[in-house]
Amino acid sequence: MIAPRIALQFLTRLPVSLPGMPTPEQIGRSLLWYPAVGLLLGLLLWLAHLLLGQTPDVLQAAIILALWVGLSGGLHLDGLADTADAWVGGFGDPGRTLAIMKDPRSGPIAVVVLVLLLLLKFAALLSLLQAGQGIYLVLLPWLGRSLLPLLLATTPYVRAGGLGQALVDHLPRRQLPWVLGGHVAAMLLLGWGALIALATALALFVWLRRALMQRLGGTTGDTAGALLELAECAALLALALSL
Protein backbone atom coordinates (compact mmCIF):
# COMPACT_ATOMS: atom_id res chain seq x y z
CA MET A 1 0.00 0.00 0.00
CA ILE A 2 1.41 3.35 -1.01
CA ALA A 3 -0.85 5.61 1.11
CA PRO A 4 0.79 4.80 4.49
CA ARG A 5 4.22 5.25 2.94
CA ILE A 6 3.20 8.69 1.65
CA ALA A 7 2.05 9.62 5.15
CA LEU A 8 5.30 8.37 6.68
CA GLN A 9 7.44 10.20 4.14
CA PHE A 10 5.57 13.48 4.60
CA LEU A 11 5.16 13.50 8.39
CA THR A 12 8.49 11.98 9.46
CA ARG A 13 12.16 11.82 8.62
CA LEU A 14 12.14 8.03 8.69
CA PRO A 15 13.82 6.48 5.62
CA VAL A 16 10.79 5.74 3.43
CA SER A 17 10.90 5.59 -0.36
CA LEU A 18 8.03 5.61 -2.86
CA PRO A 19 7.94 3.53 -6.05
CA GLY A 20 7.08 6.60 -8.09
CA MET A 21 5.20 9.89 -8.10
CA PRO A 22 1.92 9.32 -6.23
CA THR A 23 -1.39 10.26 -7.79
CA PRO A 24 -3.61 12.94 -6.19
CA GLU A 25 -5.99 10.17 -5.11
CA GLN A 26 -3.18 8.32 -3.33
CA ILE A 27 -2.08 11.54 -1.65
CA GLY A 28 -5.63 12.11 -0.43
CA ARG A 29 -5.89 8.57 0.95
CA SER A 30 -2.67 9.08 2.89
CA LEU A 31 -4.60 11.37 5.27
CA LEU A 32 -6.35 8.31 6.68
CA TRP A 33 -2.93 7.11 7.87
CA TYR A 34 -1.90 10.28 9.69
CA PRO A 35 -3.20 9.03 13.08
CA ALA A 36 -1.33 5.74 12.64
CA VAL A 37 1.88 7.63 11.87
CA GLY A 38 1.33 9.64 15.04
CA LEU A 39 0.90 6.41 16.99
CA LEU A 40 4.17 5.10 15.56
CA LEU A 41 5.99 8.28 16.58
CA GLY A 42 4.50 8.04 20.06
CA LEU A 43 5.65 4.44 20.41
CA LEU A 44 9.17 5.46 19.37
CA LEU A 45 9.20 8.20 22.02
CA TRP A 46 7.96 5.75 24.65
CA LEU A 47 10.63 3.25 23.59
CA ALA A 48 13.27 5.96 24.00
CA HIS A 49 11.87 6.65 27.48
CA LEU A 50 12.19 2.98 28.40
CA LEU A 51 15.74 2.77 27.05
CA LEU A 52 16.70 5.91 29.01
CA GLY A 53 15.20 4.58 32.22
CA GLN A 54 18.33 5.17 34.32
CA THR A 55 18.97 8.64 32.89
CA PRO A 56 18.21 11.68 35.09
CA ASP A 57 14.75 13.03 34.33
CA VAL A 58 15.98 16.46 33.20
CA LEU A 59 18.39 14.97 30.68
CA GLN A 60 15.84 12.39 29.58
CA ALA A 61 13.23 15.09 28.96
CA ALA A 62 15.70 17.05 26.83
CA ILE A 63 16.68 13.99 24.79
CA ILE A 64 13.08 12.93 24.21
CA LEU A 65 12.08 16.46 23.18
CA ALA A 66 15.00 16.60 20.73
CA LEU A 67 13.96 13.21 19.33
CA TRP A 68 10.35 14.43 19.11
CA VAL A 69 11.43 17.38 16.98
CA GLY A 70 13.93 15.36 14.96
CA LEU A 71 11.53 12.60 13.98
CA SER A 72 9.30 15.13 12.22
CA GLY A 73 12.18 17.23 10.91
CA GLY A 74 10.71 20.31 12.56
CA LEU A 75 8.03 20.38 9.85
CA HIS A 76 5.20 21.50 12.12
CA LEU A 77 7.38 23.90 14.10
CA ASP A 78 8.11 25.63 10.81
CA GLY A 79 4.37 25.95 10.20
CA LEU A 80 3.87 27.41 13.67
CA ALA A 81 6.68 29.92 13.11
CA ASP A 82 5.24 31.06 9.79
CA THR A 83 1.75 31.31 11.27
CA ALA A 84 2.94 33.35 14.26
CA ASP A 85 4.79 35.84 12.07
CA ALA A 86 1.85 36.16 9.69
CA TRP A 87 -0.77 36.46 12.43
CA VAL A 88 0.98 39.37 14.09
CA GLY A 89 2.32 41.04 10.94
CA GLY A 90 -0.91 40.62 8.98
CA PHE A 91 -2.79 43.16 11.13
CA GLY A 92 -6.05 41.31 10.52
CA ASP A 93 -5.82 41.48 6.73
CA PRO A 94 -6.25 38.04 5.06
CA GLY A 95 -4.16 38.81 1.97
CA ARG A 96 -1.29 40.30 3.97
CA THR A 97 -1.42 37.39 6.42
CA LEU A 98 -1.14 34.82 3.62
CA ALA A 99 1.67 36.76 1.94
CA ILE A 100 3.75 36.89 5.14
CA MET A 101 3.05 33.21 5.78
CA LYS A 102 4.58 32.35 2.42
CA ASP A 103 7.80 34.26 3.20
CA PRO A 104 10.45 31.66 4.22
CA ARG A 105 12.20 34.11 6.56
CA SER A 106 11.42 33.97 10.28
CA GLY A 107 10.94 37.17 12.25
CA PRO A 108 11.35 37.80 16.00
CA ILE A 109 7.75 36.80 16.74
CA ALA A 110 8.36 33.36 15.24
CA VAL A 111 11.50 32.89 17.33
CA VAL A 112 9.77 33.94 20.55
CA VAL A 113 6.80 31.63 19.92
CA LEU A 114 9.04 28.64 19.15
CA VAL A 115 11.19 29.22 22.24
CA LEU A 116 8.13 29.51 24.48
CA LEU A 117 6.50 26.42 23.00
CA LEU A 118 9.61 24.26 23.39
CA LEU A 119 10.16 25.58 26.92
CA LEU A 120 6.60 24.69 27.90
CA LYS A 121 6.89 21.27 26.28
CA PHE A 122 10.15 20.58 28.11
CA ALA A 123 8.79 21.64 31.51
CA ALA A 124 5.56 19.66 31.10
CA LEU A 125 7.44 16.63 29.76
CA LEU A 126 9.77 16.74 32.76
CA SER A 127 6.76 16.82 35.12
CA LEU A 128 5.25 13.86 33.30
CA LEU A 129 8.43 11.81 33.59
CA GLN A 130 8.92 12.69 37.25
CA ALA A 131 5.38 11.48 37.94
CA GLY A 132 6.11 8.15 36.25
CA GLN A 133 3.58 8.78 33.47
CA GLY A 134 5.83 8.22 30.48
CA ILE A 135 3.15 6.08 28.83
CA TYR A 136 1.45 9.29 27.69
CA LEU A 137 4.33 9.86 25.30
CA VAL A 138 2.45 7.40 23.09
CA LEU A 139 -0.66 9.58 23.12
CA LEU A 140 0.61 13.06 22.30
CA PRO A 141 1.94 12.65 18.72
CA TRP A 142 -0.96 10.28 18.03
CA LEU A 143 -3.51 12.87 19.12
CA GLY A 144 -1.80 15.75 17.33
CA ARG A 145 -1.66 14.01 13.97
CA SER A 146 -5.25 12.84 14.28
CA LEU A 147 -6.34 16.49 14.25
CA LEU A 148 -4.80 17.17 10.82
CA PRO A 149 -7.32 15.17 8.74
CA LEU A 150 -10.12 16.52 10.93
CA LEU A 151 -9.04 20.09 10.16
CA LEU A 152 -8.68 19.48 6.42
CA ALA A 153 -12.04 17.69 6.26
CA THR A 154 -13.95 20.48 8.00
CA THR A 155 -12.17 23.64 6.85
CA PRO A 156 -11.73 25.18 3.38
CA TYR A 157 -8.18 25.19 2.02
CA VAL A 158 -7.35 28.75 1.03
CA ARG A 159 -4.05 28.34 -0.82
CA ALA A 160 -4.82 26.82 -4.22
CA GLY A 161 -2.51 24.20 -5.69
CA GLY A 162 0.18 22.03 -4.14
CA LEU A 163 0.06 19.08 -1.81
CA GLY A 164 -2.47 20.60 0.57
CA GLN A 165 -5.01 21.07 -2.19
CA ALA A 166 -4.59 17.45 -3.30
CA LEU A 167 -5.11 16.27 0.27
CA VAL A 168 -8.34 18.22 0.64
CA ASP A 169 -9.74 17.42 -2.80
CA HIS A 170 -9.15 13.67 -2.56
CA LEU A 171 -9.68 13.02 1.15
CA PRO A 172 -11.90 9.90 1.59
CA ARG A 173 -14.54 11.70 3.63
CA ARG A 174 -16.83 8.72 4.13
CA GLN A 175 -14.09 6.62 5.69
CA LEU A 176 -12.54 9.35 7.82
CA PRO A 177 -15.12 9.34 10.69
CA TRP A 178 -14.66 5.60 11.14
CA VAL A 179 -10.88 5.87 11.13
CA LEU A 180 -10.82 8.76 13.59
CA GLY A 181 -13.46 7.12 15.79
CA GLY A 182 -11.40 3.94 16.01
CA HIS A 183 -8.28 5.85 16.97
CA VAL A 184 -10.09 7.92 19.60
CA ALA A 185 -11.53 4.75 21.16
CA ALA A 186 -8.04 3.26 21.28
CA MET A 187 -6.61 6.43 22.85
CA LEU A 188 -9.16 6.29 25.65
CA LEU A 189 -7.81 2.89 26.67
CA LEU A 190 -4.89 4.80 28.18
CA GLY A 191 -7.19 6.05 30.95
CA TRP A 192 -8.49 9.32 32.36
CA GLY A 193 -5.39 11.18 31.31
CA ALA A 194 -6.21 10.44 27.70
CA LEU A 195 -9.69 11.90 28.17
CA ILE A 196 -8.19 15.09 29.65
CA ALA A 197 -5.70 15.38 26.79
CA LEU A 198 -8.36 14.70 24.17
CA ALA A 199 -10.79 17.26 25.61
CA THR A 200 -8.03 19.88 25.77
CA ALA A 201 -6.90 19.25 22.20
CA LEU A 202 -10.46 19.37 20.86
CA ALA A 203 -11.17 22.63 22.70
CA LEU A 204 -8.05 24.15 21.15
CA PHE A 205 -9.09 22.79 17.75
CA VAL A 206 -12.49 24.50 17.96
CA TRP A 207 -10.94 27.81 19.07
CA LEU A 208 -8.17 27.83 16.45
CA ARG A 209 -10.46 26.73 13.62
CA ARG A 210 -12.82 29.60 14.44
CA ALA A 211 -9.90 32.05 14.44
CA LEU A 212 -8.70 30.71 11.08
CA MET A 213 -12.15 31.06 9.56
CA GLN A 214 -12.48 34.63 10.82
CA ARG A 215 -9.03 35.73 9.63
CA LEU A 216 -8.40 33.64 6.49
CA GLY A 217 -11.68 31.96 5.63
CA GLY A 218 -9.96 28.57 5.93
CA THR A 219 -6.65 26.85 6.56
CA THR A 220 -3.24 26.37 4.96
CA GLY A 221 -0.47 23.85 5.44
CA ASP A 222 1.30 26.22 7.83
CA THR A 223 -1.75 26.72 10.02
CA ALA A 224 -2.32 22.96 10.09
CA GLY A 225 1.22 22.56 11.41
CA ALA A 226 0.55 25.27 13.98
CA LEU A 227 -2.58 23.43 15.12
CA LEU A 228 -0.62 20.22 15.62
CA GLU A 229 2.12 21.88 17.68
CA LEU A 230 -0.28 23.90 19.81
CA ALA A 231 -2.55 20.90 20.41
CA GLU A 232 0.37 18.70 21.46
CA CYS A 233 1.62 21.39 23.83
CA ALA A 234 -1.82 22.10 25.29
CA ALA A 235 -2.54 18.40 25.85
CA LEU A 236 0.89 17.89 27.42
CA LEU A 237 0.35 20.85 29.75
CA ALA A 238 -3.11 19.59 30.71
CA LEU A 239 -1.67 16.18 31.57
CA ALA A 240 1.16 17.70 33.61
CA LEU A 241 -1.21 19.99 35.52
CA SER A 242 -3.60 17.12 36.27
CA LEU A 243 -0.97 14.96 37.98
Swiss-Prot record:
Molecular functions (GO terms): adenosylcobinamide-GDP ribazoletransferase activity; cobalamin 5'-phosphate synthase activity
Pathway(s) served: Cofactor biosynthesis; adenosylcobalamin biosynthesis; adenosylcobalamin from cob(II)yrinate a,c-diamide: step 7/7
InterPro entries: CobS (IPR003805)
Subcellular locations according to the entry: Cell inner membrane
Enzyme Commission identifier(s): 2.7.8.26
Membrane topology qualifier: Multi-pass membrane protein
Segments traversing the membrane: 31-51, 61-81, 109-129, 134-154, 188-208
Entry superkingdom: Bacteria
GO cellular component: plasma membrane
Example GO biological process: cobalamin biosynthetic process
Pfam families: CobS
Cell inner membrane listed as a keyword: yes
Primary site of residence: membrane
NCBIfam families recorded: cobS, PRK00235.1-5
Function as written in the Swiss-Prot or TrEMBL entry: Joins adenosylcobinamide-GDP and alpha-ribazole to generate adenosylcobalamin (Ado-cobalamin). Also synthesizes adenosylcobalamin 5'-phosphate from adenosylcobinamide-GDP and alpha-ribazole 5'-phosphate.
Family, similarity comment: Belongs to the CobS family.
Name the record gives this protein: Adenosylcobinamide-GDP ribazoletransferase
Lineage, broadest ranks: Bacteria, Pseudomonadati, Pseudomonadota, Gammaproteobacteria, Pseudomonadales
Designated gene of the protein: cobS
